[in-house]
C-alpha cells in the first residue's frame, strides 16, 4: 500500500502523459521554450518519482525561438514491442514530430517530422492496435472553416512506423462532448473490451477546463460520447476552490489491472497561479463501459491510496532542490531559455562552482540569455544562492531571477553604479523595469535570499554571516499566469548579462537552493 500526495509533480509540469512497461511507469510533460525539453520521470508506485533525463536534450532535436510559451506542447509517451515513442508539437519550428528510444533514459533519436501540411494542428498522440498497426490521433482546425476561436476537431490516420509517415485516409472522429465546445485537445486513444476509447480535454486550459470521453466499435467512425460528459472537471466547484483548471489527462493501468488518470490542474494562491499547471493523480474504475474518475468523490483529493508497493529513489523529486556544483555534468532539473549550452556556463573552469559567462543577451528580451533555472514548486519557499562577482562596467550584472516571462520577472542583481557596487532589487512588470531598492556593498562575494509566502516576498543579502533586509512585502502577483498570460509557471534561477555589449567577465556560484518553508 502506498499513498501519493497531490500534485504528484509540483511546479509547472503540465500536459502529463504516462505509459507503463512491466511495473515501471514513465511520465512526460510539456516544456515550451525551456531547454532541454520534455522532462521524463520514472516511478514504480505513482507516488515517488525520479527524473531520468530530458528527452530533447540536444539542439538538433529542439529548435526553439520566440515567447516562453511557444516551443514544445503536449508530449505523448508510449511503448510498443520494446521501443519507446514520444510524439509532440514544436510550435516554434517544424510542427508535429516523433522521437524514439530503446531506453527511456535515452539516448533518443533525432526527430521524425510528420509535415505541417500532412499533420496539421497540435497535441498528437499514438495508438497501437491489436494487429500492431499504429495510428496518429491529433487535433486540427475545422477544415470547413473555423467558425469561432477554438473550433477544432479530433482526427485519426494510420502511421507507417517504417517510413515515419502518415498513410491512408484521415478522418475526423470527434469535436468534443458539448455543442460548439472550444478547444477539443489532448486526445488519447485506448482499446478495452472491444471498444476504442477517446479521452480528451475541452473548453480551454483555464477555469472551464474539463475531461470528456467517447467510444466506438470502429476506429474510423464517428465516436459516441459518454452520457455523463464531461467525466471530470473542477469548474463546478467555484473560483475559491483550492484546485482549478483540471484537464488534459491520460490513462494507465497497473500490473494488477487497476486504472489511474494523470491530469493537469493548478493551485492558485490569493486567486492567482504562479506555479503554472501541475500534474495530479486520480483513481479510475469502469462502470457500464465508461471510466469513472475518483468514484464517490468526483474531484481531486489531497491523497491517493493505491494497492502498490512503495518504492523510493535515492534522487527523488521533492520540494527541496539543493544544487551544489561538485559534479562536472549539470543537473537535469536546470533549464535554460531556448538553449542550455556550455557556451554560457561551466562546471570545470572553477571546480566546485557553477560559472555563468556574461553575454550581451538580456533576460527581458526573447532569446538565449545566460540563465539557468528550476521550477517553482510551492507558494511558500526560500530561494538562495552564493556568488562571487565583480562587475567591471555599469552594463554588467549577475545574481538571481524569479522568472515568469521576458516582460514579467523579478531581478535580484549585483551591479556597478559609477564607482560603487550595489545590490539591486528590480521588478520587471509588463516590460517596464523598476528600481525598487538598492543597497551599497563592499564586494560581490555574498548570498542572495528570497523568502516568499502568500504572494509576497522579502529580499535579503547575507555577508559575513549577517543577514540584511533589502526589500520587503514585494507583490508577486505580476508573475502569475493571470497577470502575465501564457502557459508556463515560474522558474527561479541564476543569471548573468553584459546587456548588449561583449564581455569576458563571469559570475561564480557556490550553491543554489530552492525549498519549501
UniProtKB/Swiss-Prot annotation:
Coiled coil: none annotated. The lineage of its organism: Bacteria, Bacillati, Bacillota, Clostridia, Lachnospirales. The active site is at residues 15, 185. It comes from the Bacteria. It is an enzyme of class 3 (hydrolase). One of its GO terms (molecular function) is alpha-L-arabinofuranosidase activity. Keywords: Carbohydrate metabolism, Glycosidase, Hydrolase, Multifunctional enzyme, Polysaccharide degradation, Xylan degradation. Pfam families: GH43_C2 (PF17851), Glyco_hydro_43 (PF04616). The keyword Hydrolase applies. One of its GO terms (biological process) is xylan catabolic process. PANTHER family: BETA-XYLOSIDASE (PTHR42812), BETA-XYLOSIDASE-RELATED (PTHR42812:SF12). This is Xylosidase/arabinosidase. It catalyses: Hydrolysis of (1->4)-beta-D-xylans, to remove successive D-xylose residues from the non-reducing termini; Hydrolysis of terminal non-reducing alpha-L-arabinofuranoside residues in alpha-L-arabinosides. Transmembrane segments: none annotated. The record marks 123 as: Important for catalytic activity, responsible for pKa modulation of the active site Glu and correct orientation of both the proton donor and substrate. Has a 1.6-fold higher activity as an arabinosidase than as a beta-xylosidase when tested on the substrates nitrophenyl-beta-D-xylopyranoside and P-nitrophenyl-alpha-L-arabinofuranoside. The keyword Hydrolase applies. Belongs to the glycosyl hydrolase 43 family. SUPFAM superfamilies: Arabinanase/levansucrase/invertase, Concanavalin A-like lectins/glucanases. InterPro entries: ConA-like_dom_sf, GH43_C2, Glyco_hydro_43, Glyco_hydro_beta-prop_sf, Glycosyl_Hydrlase_43. Its EC number is 3.2.1.37, 3.2.1.55.
